[in-house]
Structure formats: structure tokens, C-alpha cells
From Swiss-Prot:
This is Polyadenylate-binding protein, cytoplasmic and nuclear. GO terms for biological process: mRNA processing; mRNA transport; regulation of translation. It is found in: Cytoplasm; Nucleus. Residues 607-619 have a biased composition (Gly residues). Residues 1-43, 633-649 have a biased composition (Low complexity). GO terms for cellular component: cytoplasm; nucleus. It comes from the Eukaryota.
Amino acid sequence: MSAEASTTPAAETPVNGTPETSTTPAAPAAEATAAETAAPSTSQPHSASLYVGELDPSVTEAMLYELFSSIGQVASIRVCRDAVTRRSLGYAYVNYNNTADGERALEDLNYTLIKGKPCRIMWSQRDPALRKTGQGNVFIKNLDAAIDNKALHDTFAAFGNILSCKVAQDEFGNSKGYGFVHYETAEAANNAIKHVNGMLLNDKKVFVGHHISKKDRQSKFEEMKANFTNVYIKNLDQEISEEEFRQMFEKFGEITSATLSRDQEGKSRGFGFVNYSTHDSAQAAVDEMNDKEVKGQKLYVGRAQKKHEREEELRKQYEAARLEKASKYQGVNLYVKNLTDDIDDEKLREMFAPYGTITSAKVMRDTNIERTQTPDSDKEKKEESKEEKPEAAEKTEEAAKESGDDQDKENKKSDKKVLGKSKGFGFVCFSSPDEASKAVTEMNQRMINGKPLYVALAQRKDVRRSQLEASIQARNTIRQQQAAAAAGMPQPYMQPAVFYGPGQQGFIPGGQRGGLPFAPQPGMMMGVPGGRPGQYPGPFPGQQGGRGMGPNQQIPPNFAQGIPMGAMGPGGIPNGMGYPQMGQVQFGRGAGGRGQVPGMPMGQGMRGPGYGQGRGGVPVQGQMRPGQGGRGQNAQPAAGRGEEAPAAGLTAQSLAAAPAPQQKQMLGEALYPKIQAQQPELAGKITGMLLEMDNTELLSLLEDDEALRAKVDEALSVYDEYMKNKGTEGEAAGEAPKPKEAATEESTEENKS
């Protein structure tokens, strides 16, 4: 039998890559449950498949093979792993070629240490019905912490053949104080219960009984809740005695036990328990004594609960309160960020007060850890220094002390309320959703102290996380589609993304190898192999004889995708790619010519078939003039491309009105001239880097030259660091870093050759 066909115990069967949730605390014991009628086939299975549990996550098939092959020939080994993360689930299957080897492995290797953890071996039971019957399954509690799986197995092995034995452990490997032993027959289980129940194991009296499934325990528990007899009382006066406590509750019925909880010194802890013989008496005590004042304190009297019950009730109460709070503040609580450090709670409230009634306004701050020195410590230091000085300086010291006291008073006043540093964001809660909506409309992107505010409805952390994950997934999908569209273009390696400004030649550092330091964005052109713009390898040989384009200036397929409108010259050709600016030029099919350039998409500059003479091409030199002869050229008036003009006076309204893919293009066209004035050589690169930012932040940079200059400097430092790291890698590889100009020339020569 192959390991793929073998199944796991019920508690550890993977469902969609995750272990099945156990139905009982005894689930680990029910792993190998088998009906009494199946005993012969269980002890002598037709297959030789073993289940190996309690494995360390780092255990591999090779480690298990080394251990189990010492017994006999192993047919196959499989460590079960999560379907998604591929992490080990902590158990495996070992298949032998014959049953005898499996029996020897079960006898000799059970509880053997593997990576410091004792493994647990049992026959693999493929029938889940037999695993979940529960016959022969014994539950043991009140175990000493020193008792492990092997010690428990050795203790109970005298009463019959054990199929599975396990001590429950927490996440740190410590015993939880209970365990399970699953016998082959019900008679063996009854025999173990008869002889071990109530015995001392490691000086602790243990309870041994038949395992009850969680479903049965739950139904029994609900019945016990409805017929409770044990009553819990708290808020008791500490002076009350045991006798007074008993007399207080005796009038409701016969009491089997009553006790007050006391500390180590014998003082009352203010609560106790009373157990009645009947449920009616307990219910009467709860109804009569709950919320009753005794010695000036209002009592709480209710059904005694176990710890897990109380925790579950508290969890439900917390969840209900959280949902109620979320629904209460839905649509009225605003999140405000980009606040300056001088804005406190009062100023934040004043900023939003004109838009409605504010119920709360809070600026989030860091926890103030550092405290100024207290006046007491100052006085102590002064007294110490006073003792060290000679008596002749006492008068001077007294004067200094008086002035120091005055300073201490001033410091005390200033230290009354020390606020931490502002985190730059806060929350404002209005009384109605309409007021909150009005505040968002009026205050979002408003300049406050030179910074544009970001105002939006507050969201819970899990909602923000889900939205962010959806956004990232959508972005990755778009990138995959773009990559698939450009799959026909050979790309031995890619340069960093570059933004081409209107009429400018984009700058790409030459001679680089490796991946993109920054992810491409809409409005940026992917870097090209080689060193200079316009150089493409592969099936685009240099054209000779003045036919259209000069050497190393070929147009690759899909090259126009991702180029911003402002960077597109006439005819859909990016400016600065080695082509001169000209009137509207169309690539068309000339009479007897070869037509459109292969793979060239019909861009904005190619609005229809033009018919010229000869092959479609673009002149290498000179400015195109109306009527100028050219092979395969038809001049068009430039008035038809007004939509391609660079955006001027870009506003949030005009940006929001544009389609999402064009927004980055518009921002890039507006940013490029400003950046070019500061960094002419790296303007295209820095623009591409800044386009990674949020649109609202880019709009604020357009309005604030100082902030833009700071961002440009920051981007320049990041770029310099990147180039420095690339140079360091080249030196480590035995190559000296080359200057930009030399690297560019070298890559040009490579492309020519």
C-alpha cells in the first residue's frame, strides 16, 4: 500500500491542508479507535502501514528512512504537510513491504527520540468509523507532570494490547495533567479502570474512566447547568464567619457543604460556595439572595461556573460590546492624519467644530517614558553637595538653595501634565453621519500649517487589512497582465523604471545588471537593456542606408505601453528616444511598402492608415516641415492632439475626473518640470520614484516647493545608495565599477556588434 492511500487518525486528518478539528479533548486518544469486532484485523493488519506522530516540524522523510530502514525494507515514507504553506503537520506514514517488519518497528521504535522528541507509533487505520467508535478508549486525569507517553504506556500495558497512548501537552510541550489509553478490546479497558482508578501514580491519586465524546459531554453539561446545585457567592464582608455564612443560606434547603475562601493568613477573600442537596433549594437561594445587601455590601449569588465557562461568557460579552460600539460609531468617527506636532486635542476640536457637534477629539501620542527630575531628587543632591562643602560656604549655599526651591516650584508646575510626542494622526467623532460627511468634504486635503490633511471615515484594523490585501492583489494582477503583454519582447535584464518628460531624453544609468530597485508604475516606461534609451536587443537589427531609423533606434513591440502622454512625441514616439520632434506623423502602408512596424500598437499618434511612398520610417535628423519629402511619411496638423498636452494647473478635482490609469501620467507630467529644475540629469529617474507615492501626497508636493525639494533629496539619496551597492557588488565580483559614461558607451558597442 502506498503512503498516499494511508489515512491519519481522526484528530490529525488533514482537510484542505489543515488538521481536522478534534471533537473532544480526548481526540488524541481516539486516534486509533477500533471496534471490538475489528480486533483481529487491527492486531494483524493486511497492510504494513504505520502512523508516526508527535514529530518535530523539521523532521524529513530522509531522517525517518534512516531510522525505520534499520528494521526492514521500507516501501515508502511520507511526511504530511500543509497544502498551502508546505509546513509539516507533525506526523508521517511509513510503509513496509511486509507486516512482520511493521510489528517489529512498532515494538522497538515506539517512543524513540527523533530530534529530541519521542515519536508515537501505531498502526494506520484507514476506516474513520473504526477510529471514532471510542470503544476501549480510557481517559486518565490528575496525572503528575513527570508522566510522559512512555511512562503511561508502561503503566497500562499490563491490562491488554494498547493501540494508542498519549498524554495531552500544551504548546510548550508540558503535560496538561490528563491523557488517553486506547485498548484493543473493551474488556482490557474495563480491567484497567477497575484496577487503576483511585490509585496513586507519583504520589497523586488518578481518575480512570471511559472516554466520553465531546458531543455527549456537552449534552450532559447542558443538563447539569439546568439542574445545578452548587452556588457561588461573592462581595461577602471579610468579618463574616463560617457559621454565619452557613446560617445565611440554610433556610433555603439542606446544605451538603459550605465554605469560605481564605488566603494564606486565614483572612476571608470575600467569596464562597454553598452546595445544596436539590436544585430547587439552590435556585431559591439564587432568587432570594442575589443583589441583597448584607452588612452594607450587595451580594452576588449565582450558579457556580468553571473557569472555561466564565472565560467564554466574558468573551461573548466583549464581542457583543465591540459590535455595539462599532455600530454606534459607524459613519461618525473620522480618522485625521498628517497633523503637525503643535496640534493637540483642543486645537483638533477647534478645527472641526464648525461642521457639527463633536463628541470626542483625540490626537494620538507616544507614551512619555522620560520624566524630568523631581524636586525631591534635586533637594537630595543639593544636601549631599552641601555636606561636602566647607562651612564657610553655608551662606552661599543657602542662597543657592532658595533660588533652587523657586526653580523647583516652576518645574513642578510645568511637570504637572507632560504630553508625549504627537504621532501625527488622531480621531474626531461627530454626533451624526451628516456632520461627519460634511467635515470630510471640507477638511480633506485642506492645508493646515503647511501640510495637507487627510480626513476619512475611521476603519477597523481588519477592514483596512482586507482592503489593502485586495488592492495588492489587484495591482499584482495588472502587473502580470502587463508582463504577459510584453512577453514577445526579449528582456535579458531590466533597468530601473524611468519617466520621460516632455521633449526630454530619459536618463538610465548604464551598465547595470539585476532587477528593478523600484516597481514600475503607470506613467513610467520600463527600463531598457543596455545603457542608453532606444537600444533594444533581439530581432530588431540596425537599419542601414537611411531607411527610416538610424542604428540602435529600433522600435520594439509594445514599447509604447506605459509611456506617459506628455512623454509621447508626435506619432506616438517618446521624445528623447533618438527621434526628432515633428508634426503629426503616421506610420502607414506605402504603395508597395511593408506597412506598419511589426508589433507596433496603434497609439494616439497613429489614428488611421496613412499612405506614403516607400517604407514607413522616421527621418534621423532634422525637424520635419510641412511638405518636406520623406519616404513613407504623411504630415498631419498638430492641432488634433490637444489631449496630449502636458497638464497645467493640476487640481484634485481634475485628477479625480480622469481615469485611474491616467492619473499617474498627469501627475508625472506636472512633476517632471519641477524636478528637472533641481536635478536635470536624474529628473526622469526621480520622477519615476516619486510616482510610487499616493496621489494626494503628490498633489501636495506640487503646491509645496519645499516639501518637493525634500522629497527629491530623499529620492536622490536612495538612488545614490542603490548605485553604491551595485558598485560594491561589482567589486566583490572582481569588476571595478565603471563610470556612467563609459558603461553607456560600452553597452552601445555591444549592441552594435
